[in-house]
Regions:
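N-terminal secretory signal peptides that target proteins for export/translocation
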Residues: 1-13
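Bacterial N-terminal signal peptides
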Residues: 16-29
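N-terminal (or domain-start) structured segment
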Residues: 34-124, 163, 187-216, 223, ...
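An extracytoplasmic/periplasmic, membrane-proximal ligand-sensing/linker region
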Residues: 39-41, 188, 225, 274-335
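Hinge/capping helix and adjacent helix->loop/strand transition within the periplasmic-binding protein
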Residues: 89-98, 105, 113-200, 249-251, ...
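A ligand-binding cleft/hinge motif common to bilobed small-molecule-binding domains
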Residues: 106-117, 176, 180-185, 212-246
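C-terminal lobe and pocket-closing loops
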Residues: 220-289, 321
Length: 335
């Protein structure tokens, strides 16, 4: 049988035809590789310790992907050193999609401003793949606090500098930076009281040692369920599942549009073929749409969070701008 080519090929001279065929073949190779992906076990390195919320959620997604792909997806815990150990483990890995990294938005957007010397440059060393989860922070106050709304809290803070104090789990933490963002949004100046451990912070809130702190439902939940603290508002665009009685910051009289969230994502080594990145995105989106995943996420106070590459980069730019501006204003460095 005589091969049939596109008419455009028939008008090409011999060398041009050969070059065109070679280019078409090369262009098709990544797609073919993506269709076959994965061809061996996939490793996902996480900076979060075993049993922590982001790690448990990652294992849920990994288990689903293992079944979908017919290949093991192995979670490799490398906690410590502000995530640098995990990051170094993947930075120089083969860019074929079989080595992935979990990071959170603080590591991606805040650390470049908190550390003068970083062992990585995010977009130089990694390909953003997709977020997998998100949760919003609550304004947490003592159960007996005189503040009943964000209007009350901001009015007290506007009475004068340092009339209100807030706690965080350490200098440069999302809780610290988020509170500084709230100061900017409300034109106030509050006293920062840093703690060494997250658990110490919410005990301190419950004991009325500090006026308030940002906290997630997972991190601040034990003291809230014990009746020692309560949620004044949630820093989200709308009320969140599980706490329909808690108003947003804006609904409670705080600044309109104020949001503070934590989210984690998957990244691949730089140079991973676009077709493979897109296949992982598509399959993760499929996993996150499953009802049992949504239910298990909800039990951990997470929501499935998926973005394509363009949306992911846009979110990173937005977070980097907010974190960067605030960290520069605070003039803090962790090295």
């Amino acid at each position: 049988m005589t091969p049939v080519f596109h008419p455009a090929f028939n008008r090409l001279p011999g060398r041009s035809l050969a070059a065109a065929l070679l280019a078409a073949f090369i262009a098709a190779v990544p797609t073919a590789h993506a269709q076959d992906f994965p061809t061996k076990p996939v490793r996902v390195v996480t900076p979060f310790p075993a049993g922590s919320g982001p790690e448990v959620a990652l294992r849920l997604v990994a288990d689903k992907l293992s079944k979908l792909w017919g290949k093991p997806v192995i979670v490799d815990n490398r906690p410590g050193a502000s995530g640098f150990i995990a990051i170094e483990a993947i930075k120089r890995a083969a860019p074929d999609g079989h080595e992935l990294l979990q990071m959170d938005n603080a590591q991606m957007a805040a650390q470049p401003f908190l550390f003068k010397k970083l062992p990585y440059e995010l977009l130089r060393d990694f390909e953003p793949v997709t977020p997998i989860l998100r949760n919003y922070f609550f304004v947490t106050v003592p159960a007996g606090s005189r503040y009943k709304t964000m209007s009350d809290l901001t009015a007290a803070a506007k009475a004068g500098p340092f009339q209100v104090n807030y706690g965080s789990w350490f200098v440069g933490s999302p809780g610290h930076i988020g509170a500084a963002m709230l100061e900017t949004s409300t034109g106030t100046k509050m006293m920062h009281v840093p703690y060494k451990e997250m658990s110490q912070l919410y005990v301190a809130v419950g004991n009325q040692e500090v006026d308030w702190a940002f906290g997630s439902a997972a991190s601040a939940g034990a003291m809230q369920r014990a009746g020692k603290t309560r949620y004044l508002a949630v820093a989200a665009p709308k009320r969140v599942a599980g706490f329909p009685e808690v108003p947003t910051v804006a609904e409670s009289g705080g600044p309109a549009g104020f949001e503070l969230s934590a989210w984690t994502a998957l990244l691949a080594p730089k140079g991973t073929p676009r077709a493979i990145v897109e296949k992982i995105q598509k399959d993760v989106a499929s996993v996150l749409s499953e009802q049992d995943v949504k239910d298990k996420y909800a039990a951990m106070y997470y929501e499935p969070y998926f973005l394509n590459s363009e949306q992911f980069l846009q979110q990173l730019r937005s977070d980097s701008q907010r974190y960067g501006d605030t960290i520069k204003r605070l003039n803090i460095s962790l090295d």
